[in-house]
Amino acid sequence: MEKKCFFTGHRGLGADFDRQKAYELIKILNEKCGVDTFVCGGAVGFDIEMGELVLKLKEEHSSVKLWLFLPCLNQDAKWNYTDKARRQALIDRADYIDCPQVYYDSTVMKTRNYKMVDTCFYGISYFNGKRVSGTAQTLRYAKRQGRKIFNLAKEGNDAINGL
């Protein structure tokens, strides 16, 4: 558990999202904290961005692993072509894939998110302070479980403490 980190974040990323800062954080977790497995939900937005950065880090450090926790096989059914292609690229290069269901239902996202938290000690989020969201729900659960969370969204840093 101590060597794993999950990602949780919003689909829409704000102008404050900094890919380089995000990359540096996963690199520090790998090199300084020994994190070797990064767990990604494979969703549009933050998940795909972070999954791609893990693959970049993997080019430098072959011990790094990408673990996809997909909520269901048809997760991308309503996505545009570009987002589907980016998700497929993650699937093609992932070291591990968990996908408990074929079809979407009202429980798959929460189940996936909690399983990611249960598997990891660290978490990286992009949380903008919106308290009614899957990201907020996941972060509340992670806090109750005692996980160490790093937030990349500037406007959500104060809000994360109030969850």
Give residue ranges: language-model regions.
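Acidic/glycine-enriched connector segments
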Residues: 1-163
